[in-house]
Amino acid sequence: MKPLTGNYDPKKIEDEIISFWEENKIYNKLRDIVSKRREKFLFIDGPPYPSSPTPHIGTIWNKVIKDCILRYERLLGKKVHDQPGYDTHGLPIEVATERLLGILNKQEIIDKIGVENFINKCKEFALSNATKMTQNFKDVGVFMDWERPYYTLDPSYISSSWSVIKKAYEKGMLDKGTAVLHWCPRCETTLSDYEVSEYRDLEDPSIYVKFKIKGEENRYLLIWTTTPWTIPSNVFVMVNKDYDYADVEVNGEVLVLAKDRIEAVMKEASITNYKVLRTYKGSELIGVKYKHPLRDFVSAQTKLDDFHQVVDAGNVVTLTDGTGLVHAATGHGEEDFLIGQKYGFPVVMFVNDRGEFTEEGGKYKGLKVRDASKVIINDLKSKNALFFEGKIVHRYPVCWRCKTPLVLRAIDQWFIRVTKIKDEMLKEIENVNWIPDWGKSRISNMVKELRDWVISRQRFWGTPLPIWICEKCNNVIVVGSREDLESIAIDSVPNDLHRPWIDNVRVKCNKCGGVAKRIADVADVWFDSGVAFFASLGKDWQEKWKELGPVDLVLEGHDQLRGWFFSLLRSGLILLDKAPYVSVLVHGFMLDEQGREMHKSLGNYVEPSVVIQRYGRDILRLWLLRNTTWEDARFSWRALELTKRDLQIIWNTYVFASMYMNLDNFEPVKYTLDDVIKYAKIEDLWILSRFNSMLKKVNESMKNYKVHEMANYLINFLVEDVSRFYIRLIRKRAWIEANTQDKIAMYYILYFILKQWIILASTIIPFISEKIYKSFVVNPKESVSMESSINYDERFIDNELERAFEVAREINEASLNARAKAGIKLRWPLAKVYIFVEDEDTLAKVNRIKDVLLSLLNAKDIEISKIEGFKSFSKYKVEPNRSIIGKEYKSMSPKILDYIRNNSDIIAIDILNKKQHVARIDNVDVILNTSHVIISEETIEGYVSSKFAQGIVVISKEISESEEEEGLVRDIIRRIQFMRKQLKLNVVDYIEISIKAPEERVKTIQKWEEFIKSETRGNKVILGDPKGDIVMDWDIEGESYIIGIKKST
């Protein structure tokens, strides 16, 4: 054991330990040790997205939680699979690469850059950022297999991933269909429902349009829309046949709208002069035909004349806004599309992939749809079809990556019909351990609203869909791996399975023998990470899954319940018919001090590197891990400062232990717990019990991966129980020169606890733990990470003793409070402390720890008795309730008040014991109870008291001459100990002390000389002119003392 010295210096320690880990390849050696174990722990890393080289502090939190759990499972002796991963495909990478290359749209990738070059640039960007992120994660002590990460761009990963799509095809779940989906006109690709998660407040037109009813002179259907650009694609109008509608005359025209919407519509249009001609059911409108207002500008509309009619759409039509008549554009609205399919209407869409009107859009050809809205409104005016034009600010969906407003388009896409397995998914959710429990209800609610999975994307940088279509017979061929493809390929299969190389691979049709070509689409990026549970295992994943599966734990932020956790579940059900994971842990988001999300644009973002530079890695890790895992955390510099104090206390604890154990040449290898336990004092047995109780709680918490509970249990134990309580109790025993049996027992128990604590704490604060472990532990392994964690020992848990010490803490707090009232410093010993307790159980506890209390309270004697004994130190104070007495007794009130003033004790005793007191005043029985008086108990003159939960502590205000002398001497000792620290003396160093004191205090110092020497490790005390290596003036209780000390030679 090497003694630790000095203050806690995070930067120095952490730089030293990082070098130690790297130079000695500690993780690689640990990996080799772990790989030989039997009991598996399969962890799959939720792959972060390398769109930036620097991870967000929330991502650091995520990785530190993972690291903590993996370290803990290794300490338990498990074969831990700790491969990190990166999610490297998708739009964010494409958009970032486009910016770097100065590309404005998708077509420029093809025309200016070339797909092959673009793919290489995307790959380069993703891998470069992933490499930099890896360094950031390693820098905060994350022990994962960074030499062997999985990347979703790896050919082997892509090849393995195809097995899910093939399995879906074999189950009849994969097909192509038309659906109205959100589309990004800038990225030129579709987005699934769960990708439509970002909204912006946009201002749009809010217009009411008149559709002229055929065969009637002046009657119009009145519709409302905030997307004028969809009117050129209008096919029909929807109503609810059961609603009440009305013909309303306005300015000589008859408008048809829902009865319940008349008032709101007219108010919005500022029309006060209108007349309701008649009302009728919506069923009367069914089949009514109308003339499209823009048919002169959109010639394609003339082909739709037969479909321009009113249909019943049931509850699709609402009365919360609009007119109760809804214009339907089958190519631009999901409900419009479904109702249109029901009635056999065509799907009409005049908008291309770039969000521009096509040739069929007539006058609006080439216009962006949102730009076209202004032109369309003017054309409606010119045709007398615009009833009212306003503006609306509403939440509108934008592309989650490029922030372009989305449009709805009817398009052909490839679907996996996951609605077929919805019931199975819900059943599997019940079999998973969700931490916390609300995770289950959230993902269940999402699955209950499940829609079929749109798996195709019209982009370049992604997993190519393994779907080939025969040019001759349209047969669909789906491959499940590279090997599958090679067995039927006409052309050689490239090493890189990305576009454009894979696009050149033709296959032979297994039906007609013709040539099949791959479809141009890539997979939804959520497909990539959703297959990580097996695709990350490599080419031979089937064999590895048999050995390692299922996944023991996945953990990510709570947003991933609808993201990655759901994607894994979906892929697991398709491929394996079951959930791929056993437990799911959810963590919160990192917010600023006001509870806002942290963004550079808000100016509230804090770089992890800034925190590390100011406080260090362990302080950041500990603060992160102590936050309740599944709750959002608020960043706080103040909290980091308090965390630093805790680590300083931890460091000081090991400095104390290592110093004194070295001083006494203590050799822990000579002993065992069973050897020393019989010599242990009650405080030693208590700290051993507290340690095992703490281990037991940690064990229980970590069954459900509650790292915040483990972190708090560990830190609170060492800071509160060991440092602030136990060491305070044993400090005098450590100063004793002789190695008595009880001192050896104390040392061994403290060593045993501190060794095991630092091993377990390495899961949370690995840098300081490694440093302390290497110095403090006798015969250590090469690294603390190679250690094993012990289980708690029920033999050493004494709950009654722990409860007794809790009472001791409370008594100590009460005693400190009483000292403060009396103005008596803690260093001044008390001649006697009186402790009065309420019950026999507490009496027994306090008597058991009387010796501990003597030390703790700095008292010469303690008297313990039942609460009744407090009466000899107390008196009752009775205050009359004047308003009640006045109302009840009127003119007798003054005499009753005099009576109360002169008989307070007997009144109080009677009311407390009998609930009332009867007073005879002027021959009248006056009954007094708690409504007439307020009773309180006061301590008698010369004493002060303070309550604790189970009783009262009483001390005298006066201190004797001897006690005052001892208090003064202790104040002198405190100054000398401070001066020792200033000289940076070792605890084993002796000193010579010289003191110049007031003349009347010289005899006191002479009297207490031996005590001063024993407490300060002094070998000489000289009274006179001070001299030495350091001389300081001190004011002690208004008196001047000059003290000098020097190191003895």
From Swiss-Prot:
Protein name listed in UniProt: Isoleucine--tRNA ligase
Organism the protein comes from: Saccharolobus islandicus (strain M.14.25 / Kamchatka #1) (Sulfolobus islandicus)
Chemical reaction(s) catalysed: tRNA(Ile) + L-isoleucine + ATP = L-isoleucyl-tRNA(Ile) + AMP + diphosphate
Quaternary organization: Monomer.
Ligase in keyword set: yes
Gene label: ileS
Residues annotated as binding ATP: K600
Similarity comment: family membership: Belongs to the class-I aminoacyl-tRNA synthetase family. IleS type 2 subfamily.
InterPro entries given in the database record: aa-tRNA-synth_I_CS, aa-tRNA-synth_Ia, Anticodon_Ile_ABEc, Ile-tRNA-ligase, Ile-tRNA-ligase_type2, Ile-tRNA_ligase, M/V/L/I-tRNA-synth_anticd-bd, Rossmann-like_a/b/a_fold
GO BP term (any one): isoleucyl-tRNA aminoacylation
Segments carrying motif 'HIGH' region: 48-59
One cellular component (GO) term of this entry: cytosol
Signal peptide coordinates: none
Cofactor (UniProt): Zn(2+)
Ranges spanned by the short sequence motif 'KMSKS' region, renumbered to the chain: 597-601
Subcellular location: Cytoplasm
GO molecular function: aminoacyl-tRNA deacylase activity; ATP binding; isoleucine-tRNA ligase activity; tRNA binding; zinc ion binding
EC number, UniProt record: 6.1.1.5
Function: Catalyzes the attachment of isoleucine to tRNA(Ile). As IleRS can inadvertently accommodate and process structurally similar amino acids such as valine, to avoid such errors it has two additional distinct tRNA(Ile)-dependent editing activities. One activity is designated as 'pretransfer' editing and involves the hydrolysis of activated Val-AMP. The other activity is designated 'posttransfer' editing and involves deacylation of mischarged Val-tRNA(Ile).
Recorded domain comment: IleRS has two distinct active sites: one for aminoacylation and one for editing. The misactivated valine is translocated from the active site to the editing site, which sterically excludes the correctly activated isoleucine. The single editing site contains two valyl binding pockets, one specific for each substrate (Val-AMP or Val-tRNA(Ile)).
Cross-referenced Pfam families: Anticodon_1, DUF5915, tRNA-synt_1
Lineage per the UniProt record: Archaea, Thermoproteota, Thermoprotei, Sulfolobales, Sulfolobaceae
Main location class: cytoplasm
Keywords: Aminoacyl-tRNA synthetase, ATP-binding, Cytoplasm, Ligase, Metal-binding, Nucleotide-binding, Protein biosynthesis, Zinc
